[in-house]
Amino acid sequence: ADLRGANLRRADLSGANLDYSCYPLWCGSLHLKADKRLACQLAYHLCSMQCDDADYIKMRNSILGFANQFHRADECGELKEREI
């Protein structure tokens, strides 16, 4: 499905396979319903960012266990803690 311009606010994406897709980062995608698979995938992508901010690194390290449950973590590589 072509979701360009779609308002995903409060959308239920539980069970959706969003591999190789683009997640919109605008207000219309806030408050969606997701299952653990998608939440881990989004957390993994968040944790894979190269950001040197101390607050980001603290947050990142605190959710690594969850993020590394991403269904493709074996293929993409387990993320390790970073020092501040």
List the model feature ranges, each with a label.
Residues 1-4, 9-84:
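Intrinsic low-complexity/IDR segments
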